[in-house]
Amino acid sequence: MKKLQTLWMQEYPQAIHEGFIPDNLRVLVMAPHPDDFDAIGVTLRFLAENNNFLHVAVIRTGSGVDDSYLPDLALAGKADLREREQKNSAHFFGLPEHKLTFHSLAKDEQDHLLGNAENYHELMEIVADKAPDIIFLPHGNDTNNGHRVTCSLVRQVAARYSRPIVLFLNRDVKTIAMRTDLYTPFGQEMADWKAELLRFHDSQQQRNLVTRGHGFDERILLLNNQIARDLGLDALFAEAFELEFYNVSADAK
């Protein structure tokens, strides 16, 4: 059984850097929506280039697609659209097709994710199958239902899982508050790459242009710029994470 001693013994906050995360640690991204993967794309690109095992599990949803984007498109069709957008962005990222899976979980009539036993067991099956050491997902202290419920369920899974595991909870545009333990700083060249990655989610790009006056790409990068300024970094941008360790014994410290 692998132990997460390297991460457990660190002092925080600090930047993710070369050699910080051992390449034998397995990484799972648990995305409540298509595009949550892309929102932390720079960190995940670093891990892919670090040769970590990387799998992305995306919860299917049709939320966030305005009726005006494709008139007469039903909720199931919107979910299919968002799945195609995620597949296209993952292809641009360089993620192999078999490393990206989509999962239909129980929702209410408004397409809100339910925090029920059925969904808990579905997520437990994903974790048991992929056997991750690290799970990335949006922080649960968030105004978005999907982020809150997914985080709650994954925390339950992690607490009852048979192996040590650490959650990397990322700061999102809808995060209310969180502690920053790790961050990935980056400059303009990487920001341009990330913006292109984000624009594959055209339904979200167009919705943000209409409702906010700027695109989805700019919305995420504005957050990344704010994170860098909050941390007092020289870098223009950063992605930020709070860590939660589960099943790591004190004697491993």
Model-flagged regions — what are they?
Residues 1-165, 196, 248-251:
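Active-site beta-strand->loop->alpha-helix modules in alpha/beta enzyme cores, enriched
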Residues 1-22, 85, 91-98, 110, ...:
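The feature marks non-catalytic terminal segments
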